Amino acid sequence: MDCKLRAKNCGGCPMLATEYAAQLKKKEADVHALLGKYGPVAPIRGMETPYHYRNKVISTFAPAAGGKLTSGIYAARTHKVLPVESCLLQDEVLDKVMLAVRAAANACRYQPFHEDKGTGLLRHCLLRRGVATGQVMVVLVTAQPVLPGAKNFVKALLAEAEKRGVPVTTVVQNYNPRRTSVVLGEDEKVLYGKGFILDTLCGKTYALSPRSFYQVNPVQTAVLYGLAVDAAHLTGKEVVLDAYCGIGTIGLTASDKARQVVGVEVNRDAVRDAIGNAKHNGVKNARFFAADATAWIREAADAGQKADVVFMDPPREGSTPAFLESVARMAPKRVVYVSCNPETMARDLALLTQKGYRAEGFTPVDMFPHSAHCEVVGSLVRVK
């Protein structure tokens, strides 16, 4: 497919000009080059329709002609905003919602924030959609603590969304006064609805707040988590550790097949969401702790605690030697490694295989079509 933004230095889809089959072939070959020496690499799991998969959109506001504002994304390696009407990666409903936000903001005569001058009101708009439920969240990020005429904005937004045939479930104002590239600030105010939306994934329902970490490609996330839980070979008797657990998605997916799930996550907001998600789904065999994964597992190993299976889904920088050594001391029968960076996964596997684990195999999952990124599920078994 052709994209008008690509000619304007968007940079969001570096592989868009490459046939999708060729993209998959390259990603599979890259994973094999990095991980093949540890175990077999299965064929990559691609998407049937590799477009409009992103259920989360972040747009930046910018000045437009006639004293109005527009919204879009930064051009590659710049702070120049490219106006976006539609995007081949973004959920098509969210494209329309963003146009409704823009129209409502212009109707209220809001001005975009100017980075250099520090003037203006609107910085960003974050949109989320629960693809299974159809619910939509609008988060308006402002440079000032008060949104003038907030009720009028909500009324205008709902009317503009209705014109375009799209829903708006909740509207949240987020106040971010800092000079930073971080999108969200600390303070929030619910302007409409409950301040969260629901989505269903792998048979569980999740409440998503503005800050919730949630995979942006729901189709491939279901594939990824299904592969991870299958790789654990759970029988219902196992104690499972879900490290770097986020809002608990992998652990809760596995909870029906495990005796007990223990989740560990450093982000306290995510842990609060995980506890709420367990309660909402009636899961009584899962506990979640707010702690650094390395510090927590080291302490658990020192205390002689054991786990039958460890799920680990670390950030792009991978895990730490201390974490991996503590895993080996806990001696789980299986380790299921979910990686968003095969390079750091290969580094971590070098240590795990020295500590008595053997890789049974790896399955690449194309979570982000038209980008260079690839996720991998790896299964390791204890051999000594």
Predicted region positions:
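Rossmann-like S-adenosyl-L-methionine
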Residues: 148-384
